[in-house]
Amino acid sequence: VKIGLVSLGCAKNLVDSEMVLALFIESGFEVVVDPEHADVIVVNTCGFIDSSKKESIESIIEMAKYKKKLVVIGCLVERYLDELKKAMPEVDLFIPLRQYPKMKELINGLFPKETINIELSPFRRYLSTPWYSAYLRISEGCNNRCSYCAIPIIRGGFVSRPIEDLKKEAALLAAKGIKEVVVISQDTTRYGTDLEVKTNVTELLKMLLSFKEFAYIRLLYLYPDELEDSLIELIAKEPRLTPYFDLPIQHASTHVLKAMRRRGDKEFLRSLILKIRDKVPHAVIRTTLIVGFPGETEADFRELLDFVEDMKFDHLG
């Protein structure tokens, strides 16, 4: 039986796709690059912004033309399950995020006899990244309630993975020859604060550094006001920690930041960026911005423009 998978959205969604591929491959399925030649097509959707939703819907419609077994999973399904069921009867199975623990049983319901014989697990992944690199997802969900963002609605509240589980997964990646680990989360700097035995992302990095196989370790998605000095100092002194700060500020106007329900203000952001530049002179700082936010004035936009020019970010998104 041949499986084809279309994975849309962010790196965190890609990790889910890798777990789904392993579910099929370790049950004897063959992966094909062209879904047209597959017996089962899985579309892992994104439901974050309008363009992502449109891309997901177009992909489902395109895959339905082949009319094999069509399974649709992911954030769009979690957010719009009832609407999708009504609008797309050609889909054989929708699996929202909340039903991922039952994925084995749900998929087996499509076949006359049990076909999938293992459970979905972060310790079983069919890596789709380049041979030397892999993502390590350290948590799920988000507790920030930014006014423009649906992630907490889709993925739920922030839940850290136990550091013992992450150490086990890191060992599996090291055994596969992975040289670069990219640490991902909805809110990486919050890691460990919700665990029974409190820890933090700095301690997590120290654990990853204990694996000599990893030549590079990179962090993504750092919420500005949770970025501790200890983390900056560790990145400054450890050559295997990539001096890359993925620091989404979204805006610089205090008025707009309040409307966005973002913590911190322009002066806090300025002092943080200058601190990073001072402690890590070779740092690369990337940020993301939202312009045209409801209520943003021309003065707000000019304030943001001046701030960006002043801070000299290395990359903007």
Would you name each region that the model predicts?
Residues A175, T202-E203, M207-Y216, E228-T287:
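Radical SAM/AdoMet-radical enzyme domain recognition
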Residues I73, R137, I184, R218-L222, ...:
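A cross-family glycoside hydrolase active-site/sugar-binding cleft signature
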Residues V1-Y191, S230, L241, F245, ...:
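Proteins enriched for Cys/Gly/acidic motifs involved in redox and nucleic-acid/cofactor modification
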Residues L8, R145, C149-G156, I217-D225, ...:
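Conserved strand-turn element in the central/C-terminal portion of the radical SAM core barrel
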Residues K179, A215, D314:
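Short acidic/polar active-site loop segments enriched in Thr and Asp
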Residues E296, D310-F313:
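Contiguous mid-protein beta-loop-alpha structural module that forms a pocket-lining wall or clamp
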Residues G47-S52, I178-M207, F211, Y223-S230, ...:
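Conserved glycine-rich "GG(E/T)P / GGGxP" loop and the immediately following alpha-helix
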